[in-house]
């Protein structure tokens, strides 16, 4: 929960050759299932006989789409959708996705989860050649690169294949042309992308398998790192594997926090991975206590695992207000902090007079952890021992999460004892790097643990390029507004 990193975007795409269902409604339900991955904006684009229309706006799925807006989108054989958290670009209608562009060979709609590491160079290169950008997000750069390649190739999939030689970093994409639905996973497989089907011929791509249950399709497989899967207008599926060179290096924090607990990623149930983390944590950092509680939502599974391994009873120490957005997915620190007291309420009968082990999924800035510990103290807890089911964050992420500076990471500013004192805990223990790698032992992939180790599976910029680039763009836009 708390003051944590956000990756966060969710992508969804559906093809229904026989039109046995309503692809717009299916996408709407799919986005509901992926709402936890982004709560700032959302959108849907639908393809009706080669004509793509879209609606998007700032807000939750239920706020952006009522029945009137869904009806306006009409019917079609395929659709894509997106829920967004702004890891790159400001929060406004223009930056919402899917992005819909028109070019000399037709239309293109795209939904993107991830971050490009060479966005600044690519944007400058494109602008020097006359490109005019309407957003401050790197997804528009991907659109431009694909369109450039499309003008030189015979198919959209070949254009995407060529574009992957130019774009670097993390990207899980669903792309829709007038004739095809295409799913793309970057060459390192940083972000998840899964495929599902049903007996009626519907094919679905999504960030997580939890979206499949929402629309009634079965999980088939995860896309491989570097893979392009193409569904043409006849429903024929084929895979392009030119860039499939290695196993995915998926962000391990998908298992710790991002993914919904009922999802399965790389054949590893997320719930079991989190319980495993708790079990390992109990072995690494035991402490005498009366009750183990978890911080909703991601900390609950780890707390269960800790309780199982330690033999200490598990209790429901918090009630969560479901109508408050996730605190780490609030765009400013002030909003994150103000949301905590509204979101969590202590069950005093569980903690009063007891030595409490509080299991949470991470500590980034430390401010939320301090507030939660205080809530437990105010609820009557005699001792509060904090256990974290992830290692300390010591380095920025360049691949789609919102850790952009060591200055914002408490583990870069304080040692363990100082952090413990800062958050008001009686003791503090983090899961080890080895432990976090072992939590998803059934996953058929490697992991990116760069934010914990400063060792990344791909080249990184020399500086926090994302923030520097956004400042540059926003200044240019402000100057333009003044001139107008």
Name these PLM-found stretches.
Residues 164, 179-180, 216-222, 374-484:
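PRPP-dependent phosphoribosyltransferase catalytic core
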Residues 311-356, 367, 394-404:
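Short, glycine/charge-rich flexible loops or terminal/linker lids adjacent to PRPP-binding catalytic cores
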Residues 162, 210-211, 218-219, 223-227, ...:
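Phosphate/diphosphate-binding loops
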Residues 111, 176, 184-185, 196, ...:
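Generic beta-strand/beta-sheet core signal
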Residues 87-88, 118, 182, 190-191, ...:
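Flexible loop/turn segments at secondary-structure boundaries
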Residues 135, 140-143, 314-325, 422-440:
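A conserved beta-strand->alpha-helix junction
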Residues 1-225, 230-289, 295, 383, ...:
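Conserved short alpha-helical segments that host acidic/polar catalytic motifs at enzyme active sites
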Residues 131, 152-153, 286-290, 308-315, ...:
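Secondary-structure transition/capping motifs at alpha-helix termini
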């Amino acid at each position: 929960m708390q003051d944590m990193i956000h990756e966060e975007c969710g992508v969804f795409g559906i093809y229904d050759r026989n039109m046995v269902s309503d692809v717009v409604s299916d996408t709407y339900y799919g986005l509901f299932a992926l709402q936890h991955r982004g709560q700032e904006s959302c959108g849907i684009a639908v393809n009706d006989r080669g004509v793509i229309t879209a609606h998007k706006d700032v807000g939750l799925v239920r706020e952006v789409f009522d029945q009137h807006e869904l009806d306006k989108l009409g019917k079609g054989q395929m659709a894509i959708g997106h829920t967004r958290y702004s890891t790159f670009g400001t929060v406004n209608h223009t930056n919402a996705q899917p992005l819909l562009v028109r070019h000399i060979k037709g239309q293109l709609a795209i939904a993107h989860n991830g971050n490009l590491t060479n966005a600044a160079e690519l944007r400058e290169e494109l602008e020097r050649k006359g490109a005019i950008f309407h957003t401050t997000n790197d997804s528009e750069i991907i659109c431009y690169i694909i369109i450039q390649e499309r003008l030189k190739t015979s198919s959209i999939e070949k254009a995407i294949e060529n574009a992957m030689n130019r774009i670097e970093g993390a990207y899980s994409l669903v792309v829709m042309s007038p004739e095809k639905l295409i799913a793309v996973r970057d060459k390192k497989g940083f972000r998840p992308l899964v495929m599902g089907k049903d007996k009626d011929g519907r094919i679905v791509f999504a960030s997580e398998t939890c979206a499949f249950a929402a629309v009634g399709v079965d999980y088939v497989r995860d896309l491989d790192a570097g893979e392009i899967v193409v569904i043409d207008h006849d429903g024929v599926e084929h895979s392009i594997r030119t860039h499939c060179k290695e196993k995915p290096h998926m962000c391990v924090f998908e298992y710790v926090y991002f993914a919904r607990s009922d999802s399965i990623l790389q054949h590893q149930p997320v719930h079991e991975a989190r319980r495993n983390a708790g079990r390992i944590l109990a072995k690494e950092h035991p402490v005498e206590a009366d009750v183990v509680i978890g911080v909703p939502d991601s900390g609950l599974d780890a707390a269960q695992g800790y309780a199982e391994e330690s033999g200490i009873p598990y209790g429901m120490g918090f009630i969560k207000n479901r109508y408050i957005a996730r605190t780490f997915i609030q765009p400013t620190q002030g909003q994150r902090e103000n949301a905590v007291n509204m979101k969590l309420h202590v069950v005093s009968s569980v903690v009063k007079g007891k030595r409490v082990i509080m299991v949470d999924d991470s500590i980034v800035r430390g401010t939320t952890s301090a507030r939660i510990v205080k809530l437990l103290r105010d609820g009557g807890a005699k001792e509060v021992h904090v256990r974290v089911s992830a290692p300390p964050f010591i380095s920025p992420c360049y691949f789609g999460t919102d850790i952009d500076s060591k200055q914002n990471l408490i583990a870069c500013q304080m040692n363990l004892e100082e952090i413990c004192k800062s958050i008001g805990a009686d003791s503090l223990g983090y899961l080890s790097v080895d432990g976090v790698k072992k939590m998803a032992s059934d996953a058929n992939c490697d992991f990116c643990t760069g934010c914990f180790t400063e060792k990344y599976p791909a080249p990184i910029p020399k500086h926090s390029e994302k923030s520097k680039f956004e400042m540059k763009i926003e200044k240019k836009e402000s100057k333009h507004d003044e001139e107008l």
